[in-house]
Amino acid sequence: NLDEVRTHLENIPHVVAVHDLHASTVSTGMPMLMAHVVVEPDMSMDQAANVLSQLQDCLREHFPVSIPHTTFQLEPQGYRSPSAEQLHS
């Protein structure tokens, strides 16, 4: 249940929100999870590394399915990703 995963991840200190959360299986049958994680804008690199570790630990501790491949994109609160038009102009 991705809503349950999102709720757990959003309870990690310094995490403001989680969006674009996707879970799937690659052709080899390996489960994977990807998410954009909005974090407090004034975080240090050490704090960001700690958040990444806590995100991994959360998945391992709270969910029965082992997810060996995860990708978390950390975004500072207030970040606006460029639109497709901006990327291709």
PLM regions with names:
Residues 1-89:
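Peripheral (non-transmembrane) domains and long loops of multi-pass membrane proteins
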